[in-house]
Amino acid sequence: MLDTRLKTGVLILEGSNSFATTYYFYYFYFFMQKQFGFGDKANLVLAALNGLVCAFAAWWGGCFAQRAGYFTALKLGFAVMMVALLIGALLDSPEAHIAVMLVTVLGMCFTWPTLEALVSEGETPAGLQHMIGIYNMVWAGTGALAYFIGGAMLDTLGIKSLFYVPAVVFMAQLGFTVWLELEAKKTSQLCQASEIPLARPSDTLSPSDGEREGVTGMSAKPNPRPTTRAKAYLRMAWLTNPFAYIAINTLVAVMPGVAQRLDLSTTLAGFCCSIWCFGRLGAFFGLWFWSGWHYRFRWLLASYLALVATFAVILVVPNLAMLVVAQLVFGGGIGLIYYSSLFYSMDVGETKGEHGGIHEAIIGVGNFTGPAVGAASLQFLPQQAHSGVVAVTALLLCGLGGLLTIWRTTRPPTTKT
C-alpha cells in the first residue's frame, strides 16, 4: 500500500494533469474559432473525434498500465502529450492541429486510468470512499480553475500558451513521476504492476472483489440493501453518466459560439462559462459529507431533469445572468450523476473488472455521440437555428426514458396495507 506521502504525490499529479488537460482541450475550440474560423458545427466534429478516440483508448490505456506498470504508463502518457504540444506550437494548418489534438487525447488516456488506480491502490473500503471524495474534488477543483482563468491566460500570454503552458506542466509531471517511482522503489512499496494487489483503473476506483464483498459505505457489515435493488441503481447510474458526458462534451464544444453570441471576450468567457465546473465541485463536496442521496431515486431523477433543462437553457439563453444560474444548476446535476456512478460501482458487491471497462467505453461513446448528433443536425437542418440544441436535448430525453424504464421494471411492488 502506498503511504500518505506517495499518495499525496499522486494527487499532485492528478491536480496538475486536470489543470493542463482542461486548459488545452477546453480552449482548443476557442483556438480553432479564432485561428481558422471554426463555428459550432466544426467544433462539434472536433469534439466527436475526441470522444471517439477516448472510447477506444481509455480502457486500453488502463490495461497497458496493468501490464507494463503504473509509472511506465504515466511516463509514456506525459511524454506523448508534451511532445505533441511542443510540435503543435510550431504548426499552422487546421489539419495539423487536429492531428496534434488526437495524439494528445491518446496520451491522456494513459494517465487518467493509471492515476485512478494509484489513488485507490491498497485502500481499505472505508479509506477508499474517503479517497474517492478527495480524488473528485482535486480534479474537479483544478479543472474548474483552469477553465476559469484559461481565457485570461490566452489573452495575456498569447495564443501559443495553449501549447506551451500544458507542455511545461507535462514536462514537470514527467520529472515528478520519475522521482515518485524512485521513492516507491526505495521503500519497496511499488516496483512493478505485477507486484501490486490489483490495478483496476477502469473499475472507477472500486476495491477488489474480496475487499468489496459484504462491505457497504464506511461499515464492514453486509450490505443491507436487496441485491437486485442495488444493481438497479448501478445500472441507472451507468446509464445516466454517459448521457451526462453527452451534454458536457457538446456544451464545451459550442461555448465559443455562446461567448460570441453574448459578446464576451475570451477572458470573460472563461470567467462566465466555467461556472458549471464550480457547481459540479460544490456538488462533489456536499455529496462527500452527506449520504442522504444514497439509493434515493428522486435525487438521481431530479439531477437528470436539471441536466436536461439547463443544457438547453445554457445554449439559447439571451443574457448573462440566466447563463450563470443555469450553469450552477447544470453543474450540480452533473456532480450527483457522476458521483452516483462512482458510489454505486463501489457499493454493489459483484461489479467485475470487465464491467469497469464497459463503463469507460460507454462514457467515451457518450463523448462522441452528443457532439456527433449536434454536428449532424446543423449539417442537415441548417435552416433551423437551434437544430443542434433540439437534437441533443431529444437524445438526453431518450436517456430519461431509459432511466424511468429501469426504475419501473426493478422497483419492488407496492404492498397494500
Question: What do the PLM-derived regions correspond to, one by one?
Answer:
Residues D3-G51, L234-M236, T240, N249-V258, ...:
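Helix-loop boundary and gating motifs at the non-cytosolic
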Residues F297-Y338:
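C-terminal transmembrane helical hairpin of 12-TM major facilitator-type secondary transporters
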Residues G353-F380:
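A late C-terminal transmembrane helix in Major Facilitator Superfamily
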Residues T104-M137:
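Cytoplasmic helix-loop-helix junction between adjacent transmembrane helices
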Residues A57-G69, L154, A283-Y295, L378:
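Helix-to-loop junctions at the C-terminal end of transmembrane segments
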Residues D155-V168, L378-L396:
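A membrane-interface helix-boundary motif in multi-pass transporters
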